[in-house]
Amino acid sequence: MASENMTPQDYIGHHLNNLQLDLRTFSLVDPQNPPATFWTINIDSMFFSVVLGLLFLVLFRSVAKKATSGVPGKFQTAIELVIGFVNGSVKDMYHGKSKLIAPLALTIFVWVFLMNLMDLLPIDLLPYIAEHVLGLPALRVVPSADVNVTLSMALGVFILILFYNIKMKGIGGFTKELTLQPFNHWAFIPVNLILEGVSLLSKPVSLGLRLFGNMYAGELIFILIAGLLPWWSQWILNVPWAIFHILIITLQAFIFMVLTIVYLSMASEEH
């Protein structure tokens, strides 16, 4: 619920501010007067990303250690269904041989899903605690609604794309792919390099921006509902949107995983 001292515009702006650290002074940034500098990091996004990543590791490791050959419990069954689903997706889409792809796909799917799931928390819950209990000037709890997080993950995928291209084709083969496709003639090398370069770079950019755009829009809708409507009427829109958003957060995690598998499969193909 919006604060009585805030206008709807102030409320919306407040919830779109990250908790930032100025690396030059190692002090928290005032959201009302942010410095015009590159040397800031969104420590709330980093914190929740790391915590959710650790949560994924702890949950899956605990299930793996307690797994039995008998009748599994409900939680173990759910984990096994997720693992089976991801493993099946990898087998269907990745045709190379690599022990990294399936664990990577599982990590991406669950990690992105957990980050997206933070969007279903009450919009004022953690920011209120951060402001009134911890004295923090701002807090955003959805890491995947931060373009820095999604593009950083996409950058990691891009590095793997380059690695698998060079590993499977060699530096010479990868260079030929960039310079002699689609026009197999030396005179078209500059044109080929531009076309293939744009195609290669567009993969991580679109991968990161797609996730960011969908999650930012979802977060913004929750904020608009909370900031513009009276508290007693918010549930009329919040509940249907939250139910629909469950599909969105799952779908976006799946899409990020699938595109990663597809891109790495393409990079692993020998020509």
From Swiss-Prot:
GO terms for biological process: proton motive force-driven plasma membrane ATP synthesis. It is found in: Cell inner membrane. GO terms for cellular component: plasma membrane; proton-transporting ATP synthase complex. The chain crosses the membrane at residues 40-60, 100-120, 146-166, 220-240, 242-262. Coiled coil: none annotated. Disulfide bonds: none annotated. It comes from the Bacteria. It is a multi-pass membrane protein. It holds the Pfam family ATP-synt_A. SUPFAM superfamilies: F1F0 ATP synthase subunit A. The keyword Cell cycle does not apply. GO terms for molecular function: proton-transporting ATP synthase activity, rotational mechanism. Keywords: ATP synthesis, Cell inner membrane, Cell membrane, CF(0), Hydrogen ion transport, Ion transport, Membrane, Transmembrane, Transmembrane helix, Transport. F-type ATPases have 2 components, CF(1) - the catalytic core - and CF(0) - the membrane proton channel. CF(1) has five subunits: alpha(3), beta(3), gamma(1), delta(1), epsilon(1). CF(0) has three main subunits: a(1), b(2) and c(9-12). The alpha and beta chains form an alternating ring which encloses part of the gamma chain. CF(1) is attached to CF(0) by a central stalk formed by the gamma and epsilon chains, while a peripheral stalk is formed by the delta and b chains. Belongs to the ATPase A chain family. Key component of the proton channel; it plays a direct role in the translocation of protons across the membrane. This is ATP synthase subunit a. The lineage of its organism: Bacteria, Pseudomonadati, Pseudomonadota, Gammaproteobacteria, Enterobacterales. The gene is atpB.
